[in-house]
From Swiss-Prot:
GO molecular function: enzyme activator activity; nucleic acid binding
Disulfide pattern: none
Residue spans of biased composition, Acidic residues class: 176-185, 474-492
Further comment: Present with 1440 molecules/cell in log phase SD medium.
Residue ranges of the region described as Disordered: 1-60, 176-200, 466-493
Chief site of localization: cytoplasm
Name assigned to this protein: Protein SQS1
A Pfam family it matches: G-patch
Annotated Polar residues bias: 42-52
Keywords linked to the UniProt accession: Cytoplasm, mRNA processing, mRNA splicing, Nucleus, Phosphoprotein
Length: 767
């Protein structure tokens, strides 16, 4: 670009050539006709000269003798004095151009000629304070005090019934008011003096009022009485009453009082003897042992007990118990008998009379060592709360035991979004089961134990086989044993395998060994051989099998049925997944291939009504992402891009303006009338979906003809159903005749047209 000369810069009037301006070219000192212009000199006492002070900073010397030229002050001078015309608003010169007396003496002309910013500023304290409202406030205050004193005097006059005194006080106060109007400074002392004088005139006896007539009692018959019945509040019990109290392995039957908050224990004591809950059971067992062994036993041993003063148990069959005790010695010695008989429990004494549920009352007697009732948790499936969830939704196939938490290898569509197995932590599983499925938290440990027990079976201890104990059938060895070993050998003899059980065992082993080779025989397997694709897919069968036609048709029908079943299952699975994805909040699953502009608006409307803060759209092309961002702007939302390349998507977030502002639907409707369909760029569409969205050209069928072929050679003859043939037959035409009148008929054979595709010409034929 060419450089411009200096005479083009600035305003045209200042740098123009040959103009009438003072700085223009030649003859700038001349006017229009070239004559010189004479300038008038400015006087020294001009009001516009800033070096001459304007009355030493004051406007009072307008008519002074030493400056007779200032008889008139122009408005521009006043403006220059107060505001300054040629100076900047915040300059130091403007700081000095302020009204006020800057010097005490106006005779110092040398100081007066100094610049305003160099003159010192002095502050003078005023001798008197000009406050016109102060006097007005004092007058109003005095008037208020006068009115208050008048009201006090009038009240005292009504009580003591002294009208003469009241009038004198009022007159005195009125006189004081007149004096206050003359002299405001003496108002308050005079008023205080009048009030003090009035108070001194009142006697002490008149200050009290004595009621000589007693107050009459009211008539109580006129007062209505209402009887309100007190409703007894029911006693609230924080726990449920259980008629059976479990302490360790002992169960006690308890009963609840009606009015008291105590629970009594029913102890069936008879004759002040110790009660044992298993006394009846033990007596029945011992009685059965006595009846079965009384015929064969010859040895009778007595029981040596340490305490023979009182029996250990008390029951209805006490005689049978004693009789059973005498026969126990046939099987065990005295030391074993002492271990067999249970000692009386120190916990079940007569001192257990009442149990308190308030937590304040303690047990009476020596019952401090009572164990608390064991609260055994029910297994999963024994409560109604367990049926809130469906255990088929969560399929657990493996578990990893950890020090703190476990990991589970499970499959759950609602949790993971697919039908594959994944490893998840125990915290994630518990949150999903409690929050999503609604299982109570107190049943969560039972559910986890149920999963663990279903995967890890309990190992039960094996039953003893006594294989290490020698067993002999001889009677000599049996006589040498003592009573206790004799009984043990007799019990072990029952476990010996009888000979009749072993019958046929050899035949079974021989049969198993005979068919052992066929049982473990392996067959070669391979996939079926097919030909064709899609619906034309057929089973390829080897001819060496020599199968008949009926068998081949059966195999083909079964194979086609198998393919159709697989296709139906696949289609049903895809339809189910699509139906689940349509109700999902994840737009990547909801729109697998693309979305319409109406879908975008519906998603924005749904997002506006939900409590979510973020909404992620599927990856679209750049124009689609730009359209989504424009719609988000019209909905008063914030939009941003995430991802790279084909995975660039738009994330929309709510802001404060979204809640308080309404969307601009007019601009949104304009965007909806533009591009309708937006396809995803991160997923390739299948052929079926691609054919549905793209327009395909209809291909017409092409007819191929051969060289020399007669056109319409194989065309059928026109039948009698044709209306044209019927008209000709009515006119006298017959099949094989030409058209026309007699003597002027046309040809009977039609002219044949042959197809010619090559460029060799007509080629005259010799025939």
């Amino acid at each position: 670009m060419a450089k411009r000369h200096s005479h083009y810069q600035g305003s045209r009037r200042r740098h123009a050539r040959g103009s009438n301006s003072k700085k223009a070219g030649r003859g700038n000192a001349k006017g229009i006709q070239g004559r010189k212009i004479k300038k008038k000199p400015t006087p020294t006492n001009s009001w516009h000269n800033s070096s001459i002070p304007l009355g030493e900073g004051d406007l009072d010397d307008v008519g002074a003798d030493f400056n007779p030229g200032r008889a008139f002050i122009s408005p521009k001078t006043i403006e220059d004095y107060y505001f300054g015309r040629d100076a900047k608003s915040r300059s130091m010169k403007m700081g000095g151009l302020r009204p006020g007396n800057r010097y005490d003496s106006s005779t110092d002309l040398q100081a007066g000629r100094a610049a305003f910013r160099k003159r010192p500023m002095q502050f003078v304290k005023a001798k008197e304070v000009y406050d016109p409202s102060h006097n007005m406030i004092q007058k109003l205050r005095a008037k208020n005090e006068t009115k208050n004193s008048e009201e006090i005097v009038e009240r005292e006059a009504d009580v003591f019934e002294e009208p003469g005194k009241m009038t004198s006080d009022v007159e005195y106060i009125n006189n004081e008011d007149s004096e206050n109007e003359d002299d405001d400074s003496q108002n308050s002392p005079s008023t205080d003096h009048s009030l003090s004088s009035n108070e001194s005139k009142v006697e002490d006896g008149d200050l009290f009022f004595v009621d000589e007539e007693a107050q009459q009692s009211p008539d109580l018959t006129k007062i209505k009485r209402v009887c309100i019945e007190e409703i007894a509040r029911p006693r609230e019990v924080a726990i449920e009453f259980d008629p059976i109290l479990t302490i360790g392995k002992v169960e006690l039957s308890v009963s609840e009082g009606n009015e008291s908050k105590e629970i009594s224990v029913d102890v069936p004591n008879k004759g002040n003897k110790t009660y044992h809950p298993f006394a009846g059971y033990i007596s029945n067992v011992l009685h059965g042992m006595h009846t079965s062994d009384s015929d064969n036993d010859e040895l009778d041993y007595e029981i040596e007990t340490e305490n023979n003063s009182e029996p250990l148990y008390e029951s209805s069959a006490s005689s049978e118990v004693d009789q059973g005790f005498n026969y126990v010695g046939q099987r065990h010695n005295s030391r074993a008998d002492n271990n067999l008989l249970p000692s009386p429990s120190p916990q079940l004494t007569e001192d257990i009379k009442c149990l308190s549920i308030n937590g304040t009352k303690t047990f009476e007697g020596n019952n401090d060592n009572l164990p608390s009732p064991a609260s055994e948790e029910l297994e999963f499936g024994f409560k109604e709360e367990d049926f809130v969830i469906n255990t088929n939704d969560i399929v657990v196939s493996n578990i990893r035991m950890g020090g703190v938490d476990n990991s589970y290898y499970l499959r759950c569509y609602r949790l993971l979004g697919d039908y594959d197995f994944h490893w998840i932590d125990q915290d994630l599983l518990t949150d999903f089961v409690v929050d999503e499925l609604g299982l109570p938290e107190d049943r969560l440990p039972a559910y986890l134990n149920f999963i663990k027990n279903s995967l890890i079976p309990k190992i039960e201890p094996a039953e003893p086989t006594y294989s290490d104990i020698p067993i002999s059938d001889s009677s000599d060895e049996g006589d040498s044993y003592e009573g206790d070993s004799y009984e043990d050998d007799e019990d072990m003899a029952s476990s010996v395998v009888h000979s009749d059980i072993e019958e046929g065992l050899d035949d079974l082993i021989a049969y198993t060994l005979k068919h052992d080779t066929e049982r473990f025989k392996t067959f070669e397997t391979k996939s079926l051989e097919t030909k064709g694709k899609g619906k034309k897919k057929k089973l390829l069968i080897d001819d060496a099998l020599a199968l008949d036609t009926e068998t081949l048709e059966t195999l083909q029908s079964k194979f086609s049925k198998r393919i159709e079943t697989k296709a139906k299952k696949r289609k049903a699975k895809e339809d189910f997944i699509d139906q689940e994805n349509r109700n999902s909040n994840d737009m990547l699953k909801k729109y697998p291939y693309g979305l319409h502009i109406q879908n975008i608006k519906d998603e924005f409307e749904s997002f506006l009504s939900r409590n979510n803060d973020r909404l992620t759209f599927p990856p679209l092309d750049p124009h689609g992402n730009k359209t989504v961002m424009k719609i988000a702007k019209h909905y008063n939302m914030k939009s941003s891009k995430i991802g790279k390349a084909n995975h660039t998507s738009v994330v929309v977030e709510k802001i404060k303006k979204t809640k308080w502002s309404s969307p601009n639907y007019s601009l949104i409707d304009q965007l909806m009338r533009q591009r309708p369909v937006f396809m995803r760029i991160d997923i390739r569409r299948p052929r079926e979906e691609q054919a549905a969205f793209e327009r395909t050209k209809t291909i017409r069928g092409k007819f191929h003809v051969k060289e020399g072929e007669i056109v319409g050679q194989n065309a059928p003859e026109i039948g009698n159903e044709n209306i044209g043939r019927r008209m000709l037959e009515k006119l006298g035409w017959k099949s094989g005749e030409g058209l026309g009148i007699q003597g002027n008929k046309g040809i009977s054979e039609p002219i044949f047209a042959k197809i010619k595709k090559n460029r060799s010409g007509l080629r005259h034929s010799e025939s």
